Design a protein with these regions (language model features):
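Exposed beta-strand and adjacent loop surfaces of beta-rich binding modules
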Residues: 76-78, 93-95, 130
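Structural signature of nuclease core domains in nucleic-acid processing machines
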Residues: 78, 91, 110-112
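Glycan-recognition and processing domains
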Residues: 2-76, 84-91, 139-165
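Predominantly extracellular/lumenal beta-strand repeat domains
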Residues: 100, 110, 136-141
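Noncatalytic modules at the cell exterior or secretory-pathway interfaces
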Residues: 123-137
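Short, surface-exposed beta-strand/strand-loop-strand elements in extracellular ectodomains
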Residues: 90-103
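Extracellular carbohydrate recognition and processing domains
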Residues: 105-127
Length: 165
């Protein structure tokens, strides 16, 4: 077990989720706090802290890709993504999709504001040391954000962490 990974995962989570973390160590993990595994940081904004002192960063435009390293064997895994969403002008629902190595493993219609933990199961058909997770959808925060311009008002999104259990 990678105790540094487990410690980072433990510190990143809220108090109510820590008991679960001690039971389920992640196979792979990336969070906004350290940007480990991010394929391209150009899609992510500066690191910020929310009211609970948890690190997040803005997602500028989909799709965003994160490379997760771990000891992946054949079998079933659970992917969890924690993200925050805030609506502007467009009425919900918003579509969010997650792909693992080019295969869609989950799709959600998000209808509520706030912080969400999305979960999807997927099968790993071949062993490997890394997977690439791509998050896509009809949400973004443009660089020249203007809440009064109807063409620019879409869903605001920020990224907390992603884990594979």
């Amino acid at each position: 077990m990678d105790f540094a990974l487990l410690r980072r995962w433990y510190l990143q989570k809220g108090i109510w989720e820590r008991e679960e973390i001690l039971r389920l160590a992640p196979v792979a993990y990336a969070c906004a706090g350290d940007m480990v595994g991010f394929k391209s940081s150009e899609h992510f904004g500066a690191l910020q802290l929310d009211s609970n002192q948890e690190a997040y960063c803005w997602i500028h435009s989909p799709p965003v890709s994160i490379r997760l390293e771990g000891a992946f064997s054949e079998g079933e895994y659970v992917l969890r993504l924690k993200a925050g969403v805030g609506f502007l002008a467009k009425s919900p629902p918003y579509r969010v999709a997650v792909n693992v190595d080019g295969r869609e493993v989950g799709e959600w219609n998000v209808e509520t504001e706030g912080v969400l933990i999305l979960e999807a199961k997927f099968n790993q058909s071949r062993p490997g040391k890394e997977i690439e997770v791509t998050v896509d959808g009809d949400w973004f925060r443009p660089a020249e954000f203007d809440p009064n311009n109807p063409d620019r008002r879409k869903l605001l999104a920020h990224f907390y962490w992603i884990a594979v259990l």
